[in-house]
Amino acid sequence: MKPIKTLPLLLLLLGIIVGTFAGCATSASHGAPDSITSLEDFKNAKLGVVTGSVYDGHSKALFPNAKLAYYQTFADLFQCVQQGKIDGFMADEANFNAVKRVGADLSALKVPDLCVEVGYGFQKNARGEALKAEMDAFLATLRSDGTVDRLIEKWYGSAEPTQTLEKPDFSDNPTPISIAIDSSRKPFVYMLNGSYAGFEAEILYMFCEAYGYRPSFSGVPFASGLAGLASGRFDVVVGGLYVTDERAQSVHFSEPHTYADVVMVSHNAEEASASFFANFKENFEKTFILEGRWKQICKGIGTTMLISAASMVFGSLLGFLLYLLSKNSYKCISSTAKAIGKVYARIVAGTPIVVILMILFYVVFAKYKNVGSTVIAIVAFSFSFGSFVYRHMGVSVGSVEFGQTEAAYALGYSKTKAFFKIVLPQAMTVFLPSFCSEVVSLIKATAIVGYIAVSDLTKVGDIIRSNTFEAFFPLISTALIYFLLTWIVASLFNILKRKLEPKRRSEDVILKGVER
């Protein structure tokens, strides 16, 4: 059977296996009673906490014997508690009510004498202080004219907003402003019909329009947003940011726009659906059809392939150029290139690509806000891919017998012509298989670019997951799409390899241009 015919069977088999295990998933208690009726039931429970959130300290203080598990976003917590991975977690009541509106199987118990203040975060410098003063004045105006009350009813009320937030045209505004948004923080800010929406998002749009700012938005978790704020990459952080004395030492906070009670969220087994398959159609529609989310997925695929293709091209040029310089006739040039190549290859081999990515984003290009996240991702992966090309070009060219070069010289070829006409074509048959594997690895590795606010395929899947609070379809569809992309790329390279194999080429093709 040909490999191409096995693809549908593999996809079908994968879907059946994953669907079966997902359908068999059940909630499990980790020290808490099956039915939670009071806060006392959480004393020996497994509790979820968002890394760096204020609830870390509160959870430890209220439940010292509980086991804590740390997650990236509140959306992760809502999903994990429904799947039984944790028994509960702390959240603000506004966030809980917004998630509950979409039909999540959750219940909540209010934590006595505990509330949180939510505001906007700005840089701890003169510009940040000026922005804070403007935002405070703007919020005071919105409170006095009743706009805040109207927005509270709109975004915090019992009805789920369905209308896309109208975004003003900021293109003519003179002053740029870089904004980090954690879009997993419904109802403060989240994605609705492919655009940012929510209480904070609407106020932010009005603020930029009133003060003449031209915003650029970057979707990142709040912890990454705070890091970018400290490095100067962002001017504002938005996403249900809690105001605390500790954070105020490094962040200018606006006056709180929301005061919310804190609740302990747990899974409500009585409201749980009968089975996975009973909600299969509904979950499919929420993931792909509702709000045209399939369009977001297509854009994510395009971004992933753009980064992969550009990194492959620029990385190949970088690695090949460095290899040519290392073989230069002038010893000073070749020695320098070899030394650079050795250090370069060692740095890439010993440093995780995600660290390189974040260094470029938060340190090297922190002050260059006009350099987009996608460009930075291409630079990082080109840097990494170039190291592979440099190392493997040496191995591949070294596999060609030196007698081939001597024969070319005997025929009157120059050193350059002998390399490009005789040696390199033979080296390609050794180079291409590993090159193909590295390109496939490159495509999969780009899944981390969401760390620097690039809306690639994985990031889009996370955004959809944070809106639907369903993990199955966003994650499985992302995995299948990566599988298809890498399979297609590998198939194309296999075709190219077959065309370059001497045994498969006719005599006329091999001797083309040779006088007989």
Q: Language-model segments: what does each one mean?
A:
Residues 1-10:
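Bacterial N-terminal signal peptides that target proteins for export
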Residues 25-26, 53, 60, 95-97, ...:
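Extended ligand-binding regions for polar small-molecule ligands
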Residues 26-42, 52, 93-117, 124-125, ...:
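Acidic, polar ligand-binding/catalytic clefts
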Residues 30-103, 127-128, 278:
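Pocket-lining segment of extracytoplasmic ligand-binding domains
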Residues 31, 44-51, 61-80, 173-241, ...:
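Extracytoplasmic small-molecule ligand-binding "clamshell" domains
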Residues 57-58, 130, 186-191, 246:
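Short, solvent-exposed loop/turn elements at domain surfaces
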Residues 273-516:
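Transmembrane alpha-helices and adjacent helix-loop boundaries
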